[in-house]
From Swiss-Prot:
Name of the featured protein: Homoserine O-acetyltransferase
GO CC term (a single one): cytoplasm
Gene encoding the protein: metAA
CDD domains: GATase1_HTS
Signal peptide: none
Amino acid sequence: MPIKLPDELPATEILAQENIFVMKDSRAFTQDIRPLRIVILNLMPVKETTETQLLRLLGNTPLQVEIVLLHMSSHTSKNTSEEHLSLFYKTFEEIRDQRFDGMIITGAPVEQLEFTDVTYWQELTEILDWKMENVTSTLHICWGAQAGLYHHFGVQKHPLPEKMFGIFPHTLNKQNVKLFRGFDNYFHIPHSRHTENRREDIEQVPELEILSESDEAGVYIVATRDGRQIFVTGHSEYDPTTLQDEYQRDVNKGLDIAVPRNYYPKDDPSREPIVTWRAHANLMFSNWLNYYVYQETPYDLNNDKR
């Protein structure tokens, strides 16, 4: 089944060309079926890139999905046009009286700031509280995961001696977890961050369990025991060239940045990156939508009593 997108959204044409099953609003209106309502809180500066990455994965499932894109009204975007935001995005005030089957909260390049120093922190905490009553399951990514762990459970983030940057091997801590259905027992995921959540801090919170981690990259996936809140420290949604773009950006700025690990053949940036995470990215998003959203959400969201 397709992902339902506005006809004019730039990602619609990009994904259609990749054979991702996209259904335009005009066609979806004639189908007598309730799509899953997913709200994406996009905190990244270049919103078009992140929305396309996430929509690519959400569109590669057998479920029809209706997307609502959300941005922070308390922050002025410098890298995404006001026209794009006004055409395709909502503010929290516009959707706070609605309910959703699922939510994705993206990362943001603010991890080296204290949480309370982030300009939109107050608005974000309102959204984090709101989704506990109005969303069936939420997927938090990178800084979005750190923010959620801190706000809900007091789990601190810690600075790393150097940026965690590259593709790292991971293992599963628990078998028979629905989120990992179809996973290999050894898989690779991109990371790009200056801070971390530590195992010993998370283990102090009885409501949380660590589902996957890496000897090199540390904790990868944490979830509440009811599966409604999932926290992912890596970036399985990344395009093949995302780390390359970040590396070249920092090199051009004259920053002291290491070559992304396990990314280029023989660590040679002149060669094409090796993509080793795409299959597991698709599996994780598909499993989340199916088992944690579709199988758990009521048909009538307005009758959902949490």
